[in-house]
Amino acid sequence: MRVSRLMLVTLRDVPADAEIASHQLLLRGGYIRRVTSGIYAYLPLMWRVLRKITAIVQEEMDATGALETLLPQLQPAELWRRSGRWQGYTAGEGLMFHLEDRQGRELGLGPTHEEVITSLAGDLLRSYRQLPVTLYQIQSKFRDEIRPRFGLMRGREFIMKDAYSFHACEADLAMTYTAMDEAYQRIFSRCGLETVAVEADSGAIGGASSQEFMVTADAGEDLILISGDGLYAANQEKAVSHPPKAIPLLASKAALLDTPEQGTIETLCTAQGLVPSQVVKVLVMLARIEDGELQPVLVSIRGDQQLNEVKLINALSRELNKGVLDVAPISADQISAQKLEAWPFGAMGPDLDDALLSEATSWTKHFLRLADPTATELNCFVCGANQNNQHRIGMTWSKLGEVPKSVDLRKSQAGDRCIHDSSQILEERRGIEVGHIFQLGRKYSEALEACFTNDKGTQEPFWMGCYGIGISRLAQAAVEQHHDEAGMNWPLAIAPFEVIIVVANIQDEVQQKLAEQLYSELQAADIEVLLDDRNERAGVKFKDADLIGIPWRIVVGRDAAKGQVELIQRSSRKVEILSATQAFTALVQEIAANQNTRV
């Protein structure tokens, strides 16, 4: 390919709306262009990258025995209602684009395909003899992100590989889950990425267990917690750990404390000579349930700890046996809108009276009460007195009455001691999620009544797994992990081209002839080569070559008359002066050495 025919348009200035390096470089390098918020066009260079990633994914999926298919992007609402996900995905801040057809039938533009594939499996897979089966597809997905950002990292349209497996038993599901884990490790390794597999929350997809694959990068949206010995890694949403030990509060008689202008843990402790681990703080949250119910929740947690809202959502879902869409702190304005009397914010205790909710217009009229073990394990503590500007000291749970149900709700932090070995300390890293695998169990097959006949002749629901990779996100994550101040530095396996030839002076016939010779020889050797034949200054071409990040560069310049060229490796910046023949041989050998990563 010749640059003069590539429609390459590079930018010198950083686009104002691009916040992170990878987004900036993809725009500046002519790989993508923004069409509207969260929607991008993949230009020729980017499309070559995406095709290479796709081919690697297809090879590894096919090697597991998975079958490629293509499912409809438009999906009937009826399937999603049967699974219980329509309301959560379309109401309020739901992520699904949805519409009505001419007959008034509701449809959703697929953010994921569990419902459709489960329905098809129920029709097509009748007997245990047909199992296991894994189906996968690679296509565009759509999510109506509230705040699209970071380019392809969090867009409203993106390319994804999603696979779904169907099994006769849980043990068989576990085997496929392990096989997919291994396939994902190979995919990311072949793509030249450093990834970490971490325990993860299953989120809106659901299921018994899941694992995320993170590309480590400072700009990552996710916080990963990893043990020093490398034996434990989890997304912070999922992580568990031992909290720091509390500093005991000496037992004393219960007494009231006047605490004016001490409505935060910090101001209370400063004024009263306390430390946060001696205080039980109370958070009032509102849970939005999938059936439309609004449930006030009262959470007790030790004063030095932070609430993990994902853990709270999961705990509430188990407690209510219903899907919980989200939780958020209750505000004074919301209380007023419910026609309720003001609550004593900053001075609430675990025994806050349900009577405060008796006149609520649309909320459930009682608190659902939960407490983190960091709170329930305190023998003596300070807490709010349920009156403005007053707290209680010398309190115990027996003095308060009923102890709330104890469940892990705290957010693990770097510095916490590890569960598997308390001598190990959690460390934090940032990561970009590029893959996620789930053991779904029977959640969807039961909801959609997708069954097979087992070896005893009776009907039972499938055991299911699902396995996703963000193809377009992976491409940008590669840039985030592999770039420098001059531009991108693509791993060889997914680079749009393997070699770029830069002719310093296209008007020089000797340079042009030698460049054309190398171009033809490299093409004949099945090496993907880009020839910069533009009539531009050499400095412009060199800057563009650095920016677009092709792994190897041949510069044909003044030494062309001696048959010599510069061979430059983009990643190391190593420069060698070689004969054209030596440069050709070196490239053939180098690319052959990486043959296992090529498609």
UniProtKB/Swiss-Prot annotation:
GO terms for molecular function: aminoacyl-tRNA deacylase activity; ATP binding; proline-tRNA ligase activity. InterPro entries: aa-tRNA-synt_IIb (IPR002314), aa-tRNA-synth_II (IPR006195), aa-tRNA-synth_II/BPL/LPL (IPR045864), Anticodon-bd (IPR004154), Anticodon-bd_dom_sf (IPR036621), Pro-tRNA-ligase_IIa (IPR002316), Pro-tRNA-synth_IIa_bac-type (IPR004500), Pro-tRNA-Synthase_IIa_type1 (IPR023717). It is an enzyme of class 6 (ligase). Disulfide bonds: none annotated. GO terms for cellular component: cytosol. Keywords: Aminoacyl-tRNA synthetase, ATP-binding, Cytoplasm, Ligase, Nucleotide-binding, Protein biosynthesis. One of its GO terms (biological process) is prolyl-tRNA aminoacylation. It catalyses: tRNA(Pro) + L-proline + ATP = L-prolyl-tRNA(Pro) + AMP + diphosphate. The keyword NAD does not apply. PROSITE patterns: AA_TRNA_LIGASE_II (PS50862). Its EC number is 6.1.1.15. It is found in: Cytoplasm. Homodimer. Consists of three domains: the N-terminal catalytic domain, the editing domain and the C-terminal anticodon-binding domain. Belongs to the class-II aminoacyl-tRNA synthetase family. ProS type 1 subfamily. Catalyzes the attachment of proline to tRNA(Pro) in a two-step reaction: proline is first activated by ATP to form Pro-AMP and then transferred to the acceptor end of tRNA(Pro). As ProRS can inadvertently accommodate and process non-cognate amino acids such as alanine and cysteine, to avoid such errors it has two additional distinct editing activities against alanine. One activity is designated as 'pretransfer' editing and involves the tRNA(Pro)-independent hydrolysis of activated Ala-AMP. This is Proline--tRNA ligase. It comes from Prochlorococcus marinus (strain MIT 9303). The gene is proS.
